[in-house]
Amino acid sequence: DKLIGSCVWGAVNYTSDCNGECKRRGYKGGHCGSFANVNCWCET
């Protein structure tokens, strides 16, 4: 998967709609994962 940003408000590269942002970039979708769901990962 491709890390594009953070799912935490106020964090660097905050992404309000992780799934939508990933789709906009051409990925199949995305989800908030990793430790404590802080990162936005796009499905590659």
Curated annotation (Swiss-Prot):
Domain of life according to the entry: Eukaryota
Disulfide-linked positions: C7-C32, C18-C40, C22-C42
Annotated localization: Secreted
Record has GTP-binding as a keyword: no
Keyword annotations of the record: Antimicrobial, Defensin, Disulfide bond, Fungicide, Immunity, Innate immunity, Secreted
One of the record's GO cellular component terms: extracellular region
Signal peptide residue numbers: none
Keyword Disulfide bond listed: yes
A biological process term (GO) from this entry: killing of cells of another organism
InterPro entries named among the record's database cross-references: Defensin_invertebrate/fungal, Scorpion_toxin-like_sf
Primary subcellular site in the record, as a coarse category: secreted
Similarity comment: family membership: Belongs to the invertebrate defensin family. Type 2 subfamily.
Entry function: This peptide has potent anti-fungal activity. Has no activity against Gram-negative and Gram-positive bacteria.
Name by which UniProt lists this protein: Defensin heliomicin
Organism: Heliothis virescens (Tobacco budworm moth)
